[in-house]
Amino acid sequence: MSKFFINRPIFAIVIAIMITLIGLLSMVNLPVARYPQISPPSVRVSTMYTGATPQVLNDTVASVIESQIVGVQDLDYMTSDSASTGTYSLSLQFNQGSDPDMDTVNTQNRVQAALAQLPSEVQQVGVTTTKSSGDMAYIFSLNSPNGTFDSTFLKNYGTNYLMDAIKGVKGVGSVQEFGSDYAMRIWLDPSKMQKLGITMSDVTSAIKSQNVQAAAGTVGKNPTNGEQAFQYPIKIDGRLVTEQQFGNIVIKNSNGTVLHLKDIARIDVGAKGYDFVAKSSYRDPNAPSGEILFVEHRPSAGFAISLQNDANALETISNVQKILQEQSKSFPQDLEYHEVVDNTKFVRASINEVEHTFFEALLLVLIVVYVFLQSWRSTLIPMIAVPVSLLGTFGAFVLLDFSINTLTLFAMVLAIGLVVDDAIVVVEAVEYELKYNGLSPKEAAIAAMKNVQGPVVGIAFVLAAVFIPVAFMGGMTGILYKQFALTIAVSVAISAVVALILTPSLCALMLKPHVQNEREDFVHRQLNKFNRGLERFSDWYGKVLARLSHRLSLTVITLLVFAAGTGIVFHFLPTSFVPAEDSGYFLIAVNEPPGATSARTVETLDKIKDFLEQTPGIKDNVEQVFTVSGFDLLGGSQKSSAGVSFAVLKDWDQRKSSNQSVNAMVGAVFGFGAKSVPEASVVALNPPSIPGLGNTGGFTMYIINKAGDSAEVMAERAQAFMAEARTNPAIQTVYTTFNTSTPSLQFEINRDKAAQDGVQLTDIFTALQGFYGSIQVNDYTSYGKNYKVVVQAEDQFRQNADNLNMLAVRNSKGQMVSIANYITKDKTSTPSSITRFDNAMAVKIGGSAAQGYASGDAIQALKDAAAKTLPAGYTYDWGDQSREE
């Protein structure tokens, strides 16, 4: 075959050009990512039961939905969280390789089957099922530097004017919004209601009956008698829009006196919920030279963008940034946006490092080849063949559905040393024929290929036999190794083809016949010294081999010793799924004592922000701090006593020393938290090493209660387990957000007395919900979108439980009676949230390995602690990255 192409070098060159062009075109259009798409498909189910405790959510919502979902096709495991805010969130992880769209459909079908068994309040709100991705590739915030706009306006401005364009970008999967939708807030005055004889049910019924979407029809619509000349569609104000219209809702009409909603309530457009408080600060670019100052923005709203599985991360985020830049030109005055997290910066930096290594490897190959072949013509041939082989590999990426990522590029770097061997073997064989047999370049190429054609093919098959079996490994590890292994295998295969087609043709065209006693220049005289040294080494090495050939037993024993040593060292090496890396930012999770208010959480987050922005050695490395109060990063739920900070650092090229690394910053925050806010739990964490596997790095474990124990007993088991785990030096931190000591009030209703007085329990429940919680009555339309109408008591009436006597209901005789007559109060405690794993109550455990220990060591330490402390009826399982490891 080689002789055919040697005689037709143009044909060989054309084939090489085609391979190169296919590779170049493929490379331009291939998706670019940090890692291959390895996170398994995930589906999220969520709903809200306003005013419900975690235990009520667990009993009436979580158990109902999860009992239906158990056994859905391709489900790996599921976890859920029932929070004290009334929110329920279920995350389902499916087996790798399953169809995400079918997973979503199958889950939705199971949820629909459970819908009829859910409380009516939950049915009214609805249960949403969405395809989920945990990879927050890009986070930006909207800010009002001078405080012109509040956080509710900022969030809804982003939703109404930015989200449609951003969600339409190719590659964008979903957007998580840190903020609340608009709502028509009806702030009731219970004292006025009591005086005027108005109940909570009266208010909600009036709103439902008078805020309705009405379609009145058309005057003159067919069929008619034919005498009608025009049709007149009837316009009617059914659904209300403004605060004034809601204020004019008639609550009561008696004795010619009309009582309106505005007489007993304050009405305004506010937020549907006030659980999130977002703030953003960033380094002031206008600060005097040598000073580090931060511009603080209050308020703020955040938006986190997740990508689709097959998205080109660089292209997608670049298009999102273009939209933000374009839309910002029409922002109202005193509104601006800032990037918080851009994970593509890490992707770019990683790929740039690999590219530098790639070209450094090519340069080293060039030098080594020239030193040994000592001819620029001979050196040029492998340097032409290598890029053809590597670029051709990109063409195979399209067929194999690979992306350009750090693993495939790393494989290409290693492949340089393999693919250049084929070209060197051919060139050396041709040089031998030229030098020792005096053949012409064309004859030498033909003669050489007769000798090396078999070895070139054999090398390709041997390397393929080594790497291709790795591609058949299962699970997430198999996906990682698959792209790495097949990249090398494909590049070696293309290299063998190039060595049989292009390289001998180039040898016939470019090499010159060998000339005896050719005049040597300075470079060749120096190379001759290298040759003499190499010959002396070769002679010595030959003598050593000759001696060893007579001592075969010594050779075998030496080989066995090295093999045994390798096995021993491998056994003691720490294990890890993937190493933790400096992603350019880190997360700080804050958990206040159970029951703490949002204001207290915001205060702690402000202290941490001030520490980052004012402490020498730390503020020099911090670019931006974005905080969100009301979100429990570790538990994955909404909670007034929890919050999270995103601390964004300067670029890597500006942080060279070890004390400027993420790990150094994390350690400093741990120390500050323990010293300055000991009453709160402050945990600083790296983001997950593999996007999509959890919210943070480190390990994730679930202690599963299959014994049916109460939450209090379960908490005791978890604390005993963590106490044992902390004694192991492999554990740096181990924590859980589960507790049962959240202060609460137990309301006991005297049902017998209520029945005797003709008071309906549902009226009492409605009054309590509307007073201390809130009731989402129905909807109104604004800015072309539908928002909720929410009824709730004014804040001064909700600050303590002694105002119960202000709440009145109507008995069967039409008389107003205070619900305080039927309720007794008692202080107690309750879980702040309840976690479930595979339809069983569980405790989520998180943490990280100590310095000098790998994640595998930490996992083994947790296994040992579980074996010592968990009683019968308790088991454990793993989540996120730990499950794959």
Question: At which residue positions do the language-model features occur?
Answer:
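Signature of alpha-helical transmembrane segments and their immediate interfacial
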Residues: M1-V32, V452, H524-V578, S676
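Transmembrane alpha-helices and their membrane-interface boundaries in multi-pass membrane transporters
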Residues: S2, I416-V430, Q453-F472, I479-L527, ...
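Transmembrane helices with small-residue packing motifs
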Residues: I10, I17-V56, L75, Q112-E121, ...
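Surface-exposed amphipathic alpha-helical segments in non-transmembrane regions
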Residues: I13, M18-T20, L25, N29, ...
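Hydrophobic transmembrane alpha-helices and their membrane-interface caps
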Residues: I22-N29, R34, R44, E336, ...
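Small-residue-enriched core segments of transmembrane alpha-helices in multipass membrane transport
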Residues: T107, I367, T379-L400, A415, ...
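Membrane-helix entry/capping segments
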Residues: S306-A311, I317-L364, A396, I404, ...
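Helix-loop junctions and hydrophobic alpha-helical segments within the transmembrane domains
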Residues: V340, V347, I351, V427, ...
